[in-house]
């Protein structure tokens, strides 16, 4: 069955399957958004059905909520959950200090609030998401609709004084209309190429009037579960500095995940 999956899909699947093993009955779990997080939700759903795993999920988007319901995971709001034991989510990039760029799926605001409300954040990613320096992937920022062009101009002005290699920006579109987040906001993607000081950039962007949140996740991620195309998985923990490797086994029943796409 594994030959039916591309190497990148194998990597996404194995890291999601390994991360799903971190979840225990009784936990309140933040469920991320994106293609890798979708594999995670499916893996958890399989454990709910096959093992009787009893968890409560807090989804970070309407898309994730729909998928969680589909696979049999009970979901509640973050306000109802109050505090989460664990959040598992993907990342568009991560560096050696576990700083992240997230928001390629447009859910960065909910993702950051949910992650900040968790005792532990686990990032699942294929090996291609690991970088020496953040910035090759466009950095998304969520902005309110009011004064959109003004906010965009203020962001561009702010980038002039930032330690970045590129300063292009673009409004994210959905067909011929601006993309709309679950909160009714828009996304501006910053094409920075290289971010010299991610912490300073994150703080500065959030001071721009009209900017709600940015896709830099600093000092939030505790563990990275990294998947490889050959089935290898690495679990890296920043708190104790450990790296554990293993190889996940593909079973014939794993083809129930093959309908997921990027």
UniProtKB/Swiss-Prot annotation:
Instruction: Write down the InterPro entries for this protein, in alphabetical order.
Output: NagB/RpiA_transferase-like, Ribose5P_isomerase_typA_subgr, Ribose5P_isomerase_type_A
Give the positions the UniProt entry annotates as the active site.
Answer: 111
* Catalytic activities: aldehydo-D-ribose 5-phosphate = D-ribulose 5-phosphate
Question: Broadest EC class?
Answer: isomerase
Q: Name one GO molecular function term.
A: ribose-5-phosphate isomerase activity
GO biological process terms held by the UniProt record: D-ribose metabolic process; pentose-phosphate shunt, non-oxidative branch
Under Enzyme Commission nomenclature, its number is: 5.3.1.6
Gene3D superfamilies xref list: 3.30.70.260, 3.40.50.1360
| Keyword Heme listed | no
Q: Which UniProt keywords apply?
A: Isomerase
**UniProt GO cellular component terms:** cytosol
Name the pathway it acts in. Answer: Carbohydrate degradation; pentose phosphate pathway; D-ribose 5-phosphate from D-ribulose 5-phosphate (non-oxidative stage): step 1/1
Where does the chain bind substrate?
33-36, 89-92, 102-105, 129
| Subunit structure and binding partners | Homodimer.
Protein family membership: Belongs to the ribose 5-phosphate isomerase family.
Any idea what job this protein has? Catalyzes the reversible conversion of ribose-5-phosphate to ribulose 5-phosphate.
This chain belongs to which protein, by name? Answer: Ribose-5-phosphate isomerase A
Lineage, highest ranks first? Bacteria, Pseudomonadati, Pseudomonadota, Alphaproteobacteria, Rhodobacterales
């Amino acid at each position: 069955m594994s030959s039916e999956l591309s190497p990148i899909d194998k990597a996404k699947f194995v890291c999601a399957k390994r991360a799903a093993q971190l979840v225990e009955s009784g936990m309140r779990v933040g469920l991320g958004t994106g293609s890798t997080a979708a594999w995670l939700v499916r893996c958890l759903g399989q454990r709910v059905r096959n093992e009787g795993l009893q968890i409560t999920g807090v989804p970070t988007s309407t898309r994730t909520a729909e998928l969680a319901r589909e696979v049999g995971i009970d979901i509640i709001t973050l306000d109802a959950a109050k505090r989460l034991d664990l959040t598992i989510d993907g990342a568009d990039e991560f560096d050696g200090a576990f700083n992240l760029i997230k928001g390629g799926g447009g859910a960065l605001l909910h993702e950051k609030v949910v992650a900040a409300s968790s005792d532990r954040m686990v990032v699942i990613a294929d090996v291609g998401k690991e970088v020496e320096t953040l910035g090759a992937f466009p950095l998304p920022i969520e902005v309110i609709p009011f004064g959109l062009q003004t906010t965009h101009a203020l962001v561009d002005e702010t980038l002039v004084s930032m330690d970045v290699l590129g300063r292009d920006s673009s409004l994210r579109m959905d067909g011929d209309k601006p993309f709309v987040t679950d909160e009714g906001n828009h996304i501006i993607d910053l094409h920075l190429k290289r971010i010299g000081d991610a912490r300073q950039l994150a703080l500065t962007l959030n001071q721009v009037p009209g900017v709600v949140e940015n896709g830099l996740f600093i000092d939030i991620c505790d563990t990275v579960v990294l998947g490889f195309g050959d089935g290898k998985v690495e679990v890296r923990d920043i708190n104790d500095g450990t790296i554990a490797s293993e190889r996940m086994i593909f079973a014939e029943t794993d083809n129930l995940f093959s309908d997921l796409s990027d």
